[in-house]
């Protein structure tokens, strides 16, 4: 009896295994294609017009050309065999090719992502609503900004837009990778839709917000392909320093023959070129572009779209993070937990008016009030509310409700706002309102006051919970020297309770949109870089003001245009990971720069004795590695200089291991690993290569 079940399970498992194997096979095939393309591009990039963009590697390429030409000319030095020049030129050629390969490999990963995005741009047609109401079918490429389009179940959304009518489930897996459909509806902060996604239920009317070539997917393709990539300020500054070092060493090498002639001996041109290449920071010069491209690639793989490399770098330098409480620190599903009447009112009266104020309220909180009242079997007149005029919640008023046909006004909202509203109606405030509001706040809940005209009936106790692990994450940020500030519309007591439970450093209670800008500016005035998340139109000014603004893909077009990063998963807590990726990018660049410059110490001890020992025997004392011969020493240093670039490509692409700790601790750790390591590794590497080279010369 059990045998068929076992067989079925086995088949299911085998099917799953085959699916996984197919995915692995496809990934390996794609990686092979990327490597093949990178190998071709590494040769194509030898074009001087391309190479001159990287001055360090351009100097190496010139060195290759010089030594290659010299290999066909008669040698004037009896100590330099004929094969030496061609060997040096080949090593220099591979040094340049390895650097080009690193950059092409990083670019290739971006192009692979771009190709998958291009597949989502299918040739679709749109049902455009003309001004006279006529519906005309046109190609998506003919759509223009402000066109009105109807999209039905099973149809592809033709271009970016905002829902102006209806409600529908939309499959955004082509963009976000998330298979679960999301709800899009007119009004609010979840009205934005993206071209290339599909309506899986119902029907919506949208207004197009972008012209052809300017859509969200077009921007993504441009960014991941690198077409829009520009060097960041830090990258330009480092490149300037490295180029200056190269120029200094070039002057030293060019003037060196003057001094050697004075001392009575000459140095072969190929040896001078080898000295120059070993002195200049070729390792970081060859990997610098790859590090920057790979940094943006890591952010993209994390399902975050960075509008520029500058945004990623800025994330690594962040000092303060502004976080919304709801949805970021807490789950955001505040549900009606209980009702508390005030004065001589009854729980039935509170429930009745709370329900009437929530009938037309489609927010999770509003629906939870209706569910709670129904669960408690409290009666209320639903038709009375449906016939009234709904007053939606606004950040400025901090309350919502309904104006009934008989003139009565029902409101629910923040304690201070409703009390002020009741007083403006000429009402009096029950003594126990603030007492019960404080009780709810101390419990970590959110109190909403229910009032009708000039009379307060009671409070709704909304309960929310802090996401697990938030305290630990904030502690990690604290270790990195990053301050966290929680912004919430809750009253100070509720905000203080949540802030203490979550472990944030500071909080701003009863926060309005303009207050966020004030907080950001206050931090920036102290010389700090600020990051924040947001999804609504009212968040747009603050997102634009912040140094790193992370907008949610589910949010409004205004928010996404104001931000310099967009989270395709619409997960506000991801700002913490984005900061980590930014720090990893900066650390990787700094660590490999340290390693590259530290390498020079070992190269000095290899090449300097090799150049001068014949003329100045005392220089042999510097040959602490006991290298086989002068020629072997020069070739070993050059070979190590070339080979170290491809060996470090995985580290440049993946980024160095990152652990949350203070800046001083990170500096000490990286100096120990990459500074001291940069000194020791080449000593070992050059010696091993010398032993191998010594077998052939």
From Swiss-Prot:
Known EC number: 7.2.2.6
Domain of life: Bacteria
Record-listed ATP binding positions: 361, 365, 393-400, 412
Keyword Hydrolase set for record: no
Gene3D superfamilies assigned: Calcium-transporting ATPase, cytoplasmic domain N (3.40.1110.10), Calcium-transporting ATPase, cytoplasmic transduction domain A (2.70.150.10), HAD superfamily/HAD-like (3.40.50.1000)
Binding site for Mg(2+): 535, 539
Keywords: ATP-binding, Cell membrane, Ion transport, Magnesium, Membrane, Metal-binding, Nucleotide-binding, Phosphoprotein, Potassium, Potassium transport, Translocase, Transmembrane, Transmembrane helix, Transport
GO cellular component, one term: plasma membrane
Active-site residues, as the UniProt record annotates them: 324 (4-aspartylphosphate intermediate)
Molecular function GO terms recorded: ATP binding; ATP hydrolysis activity; magnesium ion binding; P-type potassium transmembrane transporter activity
N-terminal signal peptide: none
Chief place of localization: membrane
Keyword Amino-acid biosynthesis set for record: no
Topology in membrane: Multi-pass membrane protein
Subcellular compartments: Cell membrane
PROSITE patterns per the UniProt record, alphabetical: ATPASE_E1_E2
Reaction it catalyzes: K(+)(out) + ATP + H2O = K(+)(in) + ADP + phosphate + H(+)
TM ranges: 55-75, 79-99, 245-265, 271-291, 605-625, 633-653, 677-697
Pfam families, sorted: E1-E2_ATPase (PF00122), Hydrolase (PF00702)
Coiled coil segments of this chain: none
Subunit structure: The system is composed of three essential subunits: KdpA, KdpB and KdpC.
PANTHER family xref list: POTASSIUM-TRANSPORTING ATPASE ATP-BINDING SUBUNIT
Function: Part of the high-affinity ATP-driven potassium transport (or Kdp) system, which catalyzes the hydrolysis of ATP coupled with the electrogenic transport of potassium into the cytoplasm. This subunit is responsible for energy coupling to the transport system and for the release of the potassium ions to the cytoplasm.
Protein name, entry field: Potassium-transporting ATPase ATP-binding subunit
Native organism: Bacillus anthracis (strain CDC 684 / NRRL 3495)
Gene name of the record: kdpB
